[in-house]
Amino acid sequence: GYDVAGKSYHLRVVSLVVGMLICMGVFYKNQKNRPHKRGFMDIFREFNIHSSRNNWYLKLTLTVSTAMLIINLLNIPRAMWVGIACMSVCVPFSSDIAPKAKKRAPFNIVGSLIFVALYYALPKWVHPYIGIIGGIGVGYSAGYSWQTVYNTFGALYIASGIFGVKTAVLLRIGANIFASLYTVLFDHVFNNVF
């Protein structure tokens, strides 16, 4: 999220705790009468590094965390964009990763160009709704490519207020190109090691 301090930080922590308590209450209400055949320790006993599911979990965790670490060490803002893009590209089957990566960056560029066109074509009072338009577009898009296009709108609107439109667009495109390439490379290395 965005860096905050003082009272804003305190309010953010309080809101996170309240949100957590609400989620816990809903989860407890919906699950309390459900029969459970497995306990908490069964999760650890069932873990097998050689199962395809656990192997993917490990690959996904390491891909996202190392990519975000690299971006943070380079002091590049919006490391979360890299993490989200890595999560999007790092799918369970390695054969699907490269095709997804090939769609991620180009359609992010398309989304960025459409955002820039909307940003400069629409009056300023409409700008806050560009993100909502993007959210509706994601909801109605059946394919990954167009979901990627529409997904850029909200992120770029918020980032443009912080960095300016040009820098926000360059950060968004750069983050997605890096994440796509990094995920493909990490998948290759990971598969050779494990």
State each model region's role:
Residues 1-150, 158-194:
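Alpha-helical transmembrane segments and their membrane-interface boundaries
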